[in-house]
């Protein structure tokens, strides 16, 4: 799908070689593809550097939370529903390209572009802090529940890209930076589908999805120069990940405290989504051409 979008953007660029927006979009599509290759190499390195994964701790946290991805997988990973789940999970990159095009051509701002660049840099660092692969890779019988006692850590050979769910964080960023009712509605639908697909496919634990919410809010707050909000959401992310890395038994042994903490984390995300303003939107600086113009920052 991304290859078709790249071809379409290339042809569109040739129709008006003086429109700088077309070159930017073409470059961004290439950047997305290049990042995919680089990220795969980095994850392979992290897999070798961190052979012991924390999937057992994340599974135990999900159990203590009272929500795991296994029942959802058993419900949806069959027949046409399984195919739909797979397609939704794979649709993230094409949707990102669409958002890049909308940002350049329709919304005249670069907020989502810079947000995803920040996320791209931060993702491998977070993966290294809590290396985990996802239930589909840690438990060979997924979506059937594990029959044996699961150790807190285990030796696995798979990409440690579970914690946090960058798929969900990215889908939430698409919603935060969407403009217009239609695209906000589409982004909300895509976010819901992404959450369901990441869990049902066994790519992520429930805790991965929960922590993805403050990750997205941290990126958005940083980009929009909301220092206090960025500190709050960044601290929430670090607190979760450091606790999971160093003392998950503290949360596992106190399920009520775990559930309350998870609920407060999601509420913080909802607060940011409901009350943020768009004053931090960053317009593209024009380079000339018939469409080049400064676009005033949007308020409200």
Tell where the protein language model's regions lie, with residue ranges.
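N-terminal transmembrane-helix/juxtamembrane module of multi-pass inner/ER membrane proteins
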Residues: 1-4, 22-96, 286-300
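Interfacial segments of alpha-helical transmembrane regions
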Residues: 24-29, 97-129, 187, 191
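Transmembrane alpha-helix/helix-exit interface in multi-pass inner-membrane proteins
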Residues: 40-56, 119-143
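Membrane-interface loop-to-helix entry segments
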Residues: 81-96, 157-179, 206, 210
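Membrane-interfacial alpha-helical segments at the cytosolic side of multi-pass membrane proteins
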Residues: 99-103, 168-184, 214-223
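Membrane-interfacial catalytic/cofactor-binding modules of polytopic membrane enzymes
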Residues: 125-181
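Membrane-water interface signatures at transmembrane helix termini and the short loops
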Residues: 189-225
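Transmembrane helical bundles and short interhelical boundary loops of multi-pass, membrane-embedded
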Residues: 235-297
């Amino acid at each position: 799908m991304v290859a078709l979008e790249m071809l379409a953007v290339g042809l569109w660029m040739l129709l008006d070689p003086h429109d700088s927006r077309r070159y930017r979009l073409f470059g961004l599509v290439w950047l997305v593809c290049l990042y995919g290759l680089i990220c795969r190499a980095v994850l392979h390195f992290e897999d070798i550097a961190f052979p012991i994964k924390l999937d057992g701790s994340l599974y135990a946290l999900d159990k203590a939370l009272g929500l795991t991805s296994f029942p959802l997988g058993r419900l949806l990973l069959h027949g046409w529903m399984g195919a739909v789940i797979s397609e939704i999970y794979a649709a993230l990159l094409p949707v990102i390209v669409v958002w890049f095009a909308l940002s350049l051509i329709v919304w005249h701002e670069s907020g989502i572009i810079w947000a995803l660049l920040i996320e791209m840099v931060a993702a491998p660092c977070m993966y290294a802090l809590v290396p985990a692969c996802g239930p589909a890779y840690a438990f060979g019988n997924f979506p059937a529940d594990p029959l044996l006692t699961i150790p807190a850590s285990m030796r696995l050979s798979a990409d440690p890209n579970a914690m946090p769910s960058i798929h969900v964080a990215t889908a939430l960023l698409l919603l935060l930076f969407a403009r217009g009712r239609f695209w906000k509605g589409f982004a909300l639908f895509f976010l819901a589908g992404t959450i369901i697909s990441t869990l049902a496919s066994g790519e992520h634990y429930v805790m991965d999805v929960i922590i993805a919410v403050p990750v997205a809010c941290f990126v958005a707050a940083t980009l929009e120069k909301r220092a206090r909000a960025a500190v709050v959401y960044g601290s929430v992310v670090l607190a979760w990940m450091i606790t999971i890395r160093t003392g998950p038994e503290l949360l596992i042994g106190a399920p009520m405290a775990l559930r309350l903490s998870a609920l407060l984390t999601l509420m913080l995300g909802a607060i940011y989504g409901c009350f943020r303003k768009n004053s931090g939107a960053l317009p593209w600086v024009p380079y000339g051409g018939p469409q080049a113009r400064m676009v005033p920052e949007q308020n409200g």
